[in-house]
């Protein structure tokens, strides 16, 4: 057993065979992969997982990062849409965020800082206590997690801002271990990992709907009120997040990475999966 931030090194060193690696914990090691954590990049869980899985299978820059850490990503994961959970007061405007202590990570730190909030770094496991004590006013969160971690007991407002997803997140295996496996076993792992993403996305989407319904109705007397952003406010929030992409492009150019080419490829694949959902629905709905 190890802490989440230690998983990458544990798997790479062989201390662990397989583990969940979260790119946002390792920005220096996974600068290309962390583009996936850009606010407002992708809102659909299945589309996001599939987009980044295909990108990884077709983009050398992504695999060079994991090769250096002696790991291989078997499947891409997701937190689902990033929302804003507020303890006592709903905030649906940029003006209302000024001075608010908001727990954020990755590109969302940039977003909330630009909106005038005070970003705070706190581990996800510490959120319940931080919300309860008033250490923070709110946090980025994910609808099913608000229910499963019982954050609804200490926070009563959830703003469905749909600020993208944390997609730099996946299941990793030690590279040497995988390469030493029989081809048949390798194929089973790859096939199972591919199937997992569809199952995970299906369950995530249904769990999000069920969690929202339960929290609106109330759980043990605790209710959560759901809010949305107006179109004009959403535009302001997106504008506040734009500098994250600009900064990422500049960093990639310094590293010799064709950032614009990478983004163009990302957008082509992203549009491919959006089109599939629009025209055919999800794989499990057919």
Predicted features along the sequence, with ranges:
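N-terminal secretory/targeting leader peptides
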Residues: 1-49, 57, 61-286
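An acidic, glycine-rich surface segment that forms the CoA-thioester-binding/catalytic face
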Residues: 53
């Amino acid at each position: 057993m190890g802490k989440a931030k230690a998983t990458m090194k544990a798997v790479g060193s062989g201390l662990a065979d397989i583990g969940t690696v979260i790119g946002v914990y390792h920005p220096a090691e996974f600068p290309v992969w962390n583009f996936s954590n850009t606010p407002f990049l992708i809102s659909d869980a299945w589309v996001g997982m599939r987009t980044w899985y295909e990108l990884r299978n077709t983009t050398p820059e992504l695999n060079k990062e994991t090769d250096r850490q002696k790991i291989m990503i078997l499947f891409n994961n997701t937190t689902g849409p990033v929302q804003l959970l507020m303890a006592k007061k709903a905030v649906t405007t940029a003006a209302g965020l000024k001075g608010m202590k908001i727990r954020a990570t990755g590109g969302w730190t940039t977003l909330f800082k630009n909106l005038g909030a005070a970003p705070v770094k706190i581990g996800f496991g510490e959120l319940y206590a931080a919300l309860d004590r008033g250490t923070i006013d709110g946090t980025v969160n994910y609808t099913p997690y608000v229910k499963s971690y019982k954050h609804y007991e200490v926070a009563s407002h959830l703003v469905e801002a749909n600020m993208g997803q944390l997609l730099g997140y996946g299941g990793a295996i030690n590279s040497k271990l995988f390469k030493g496996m029989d081809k048949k076993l390798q194929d089973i792992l790859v096939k199972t990992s591919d199937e997992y993403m569809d199952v995970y996305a299906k369950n995530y989407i249904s769990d999000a709907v069920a969690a929202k319904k339960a929290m609106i109705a109330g759980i043990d007397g605790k209710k959560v009120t759901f809010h949305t952003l107006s179109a004009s406010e959403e535009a302001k929030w997106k504008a506040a997040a734009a500098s994250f992409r600009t900064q990422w492009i500049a960093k990639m150019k310094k590293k010799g990475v064709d950032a614009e080419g990478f983004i163009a490829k990302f957008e082509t694949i992203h549009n491919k999966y959006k089109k599939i959902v629009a025209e055919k629905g999800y794989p499990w709905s057919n």
